[in-house]
């Protein structure tokens, strides 16, 4: 493994990212685990290609905390997929849910996801952003690993390998990976795609705001009726 210097101060992140771009994803993970702040954790949606990051991180940190935000509206296949990967990879899974149930929210606000972009944003804040923010704070996560990739959407093309968010470092070790890189890693390690992958679902979130990819559609149009790609977690935290 390449020997790397200790984490530089915030004003040197640009230099650090230039250096990290030359390393493998494995070495980026090892560097972050060694030099990043305490209490590392990986957030996972248990989506289409989530097995890659779960496998990559647990190779080097078998007991790393894995955070799943259960909105209450995930696909049944997602819950079962989470069970499968948790058993196979012996995941230290922590599930966080909204402070109020979906029924509570619907009774007071209706189906927010059907109320245009403002309703979608409010829904995402209540059911995704708040639970993730609470998880990171309660678990005192200092180094937050994500599976963000630049090729996933137009909103992620500038994703850095390491970012500073408040007092936390956010690490995206496969930021530069292509779909081909993902496929090769999964094939090499015999990892499963999400069960809905074979039905054309390439980005999998909640059951009411996710649709399969169709001809002439962009991947990011399969979420939130094409209004937006991001759920707010990686925009606001």
From Swiss-Prot:
One of its GO terms (cellular component) is cytoplasm. Its EC number is 1.8.4.8. The keyword Membrane does not apply. Keywords: Cytoplasm, Oxidoreductase. Coiled coil: none annotated. GO terms for biological process: hydrogen sulfide biosynthetic process; sulfate assimilation, phosphoadenylyl sulfate reduction by phosphoadenylyl-sulfate reductase (thioredoxin). Catalyzes the formation of sulfite from phosphoadenosine 5'-phosphosulfate (PAPS) using thioredoxin as an electron donor. This is Phosphoadenosine 5'-phosphosulfate reductase. It comes from Xylella fastidiosa (strain Temecula1 / ATCC 700964). The gene is cysH.
């Amino acid at each position: 493994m390449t020997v790397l210097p200790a984490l530089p101060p915030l004003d040197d992140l640009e230099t650090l990212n230039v250096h990290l771009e030359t390393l493998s994803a494995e070495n980026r993970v090892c560097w972050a685990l060694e030099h990043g702040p305490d209490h590392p954790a990986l957030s996972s949606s248990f989506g289409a290609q989530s097995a890659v990051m779960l496998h990559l991180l647990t190779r080097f940190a078998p007991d790393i905390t894995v955070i799943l935000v259960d909105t209450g509206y995930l696909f049944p296949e997602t819950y079962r997929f989470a069970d499968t990967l948790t058993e196979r990879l012996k995941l230290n899974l922590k599930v966080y849910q909204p402070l109020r149930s979906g029924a509570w929210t619907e009774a007071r606000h209706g189906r927010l996801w059907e109320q245009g972009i403002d309703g979608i944003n409010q829904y995402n804040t209540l059911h995704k952003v708040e639970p993730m923010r609470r998880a990171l704070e309660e678990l005192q996560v200092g180094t937050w690993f994500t599976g963000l990739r630049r090729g996933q959407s137009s909103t992620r093309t500038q994703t850095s390998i390491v970012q500073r968010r408040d007092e936390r470092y956010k690490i995206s070790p496969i930021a530069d990976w292509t779909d081909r890189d993902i496929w090769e890693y999964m094939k090499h390690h015999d990892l499963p795609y999400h069960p809905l992958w074979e039905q054309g679902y390439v980005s999998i979130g909640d059951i009411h705001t996710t649709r399969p990819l169709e001809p002439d559609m962009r991947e990011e149009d399969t979420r939130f009726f094409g209004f937006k790609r991001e759920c707010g977690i990686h925009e606001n935290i």
